């Protein structure tokens, strides 16, 4: 099973992220978002950032997860290449505890597209044939 695949969207970047469970989908979605920006295979997992989010549903949680990672990238000038996510149901919604691993942007990192924002446009999470997949469109 591939972790993610890109699809054509005019002036934006779109991808499907796949996983056997919701956590794996969220990890692969984060990896795909950073793959839009750089070759993540060349980004060392030298530093960690911890993220905690509570949202009312799966789609909102995915949006909030990616949006928080993009905020950290934009404010700390860091690229991520590895992710670990744990999702639990709580009384107030779904709670995500995640770790993103990467390093500060260096001259040697390939510069691809700049992601301006995560969008809700066409975002969905589907359960199909024992797998879960999520569609995400990023504003470039």
UniProtKB/Swiss-Prot annotation:
- Signal peptide boundaries: none
Q: Where does Ca(2+) bind?
A: 12, 139-140
GO molecular-function term, one example from the UniProt record: calcium ion binding
- Single biological process term from Gene Ontology: tRNA splicing, via endonucleolytic cleavage and ligation
Q: Which UniProt keywords apply?
A: Calcium, Metal-binding, tRNA processing
Q: Which family does it belong to?
A: Belongs to the archease family.
User: Which HAMAP family does this UniProt record tie to the protein?
Assistant: Archease_arch (MF_01222)
- According to UniProt, the name of this protein is Protein archease
What species is given as this protein's source?
Methanothermobacter thermautotrophicus (strain ATCC 29096 / DSM 1053 / JCM 10044 / NBRC 100330 / Delta H)
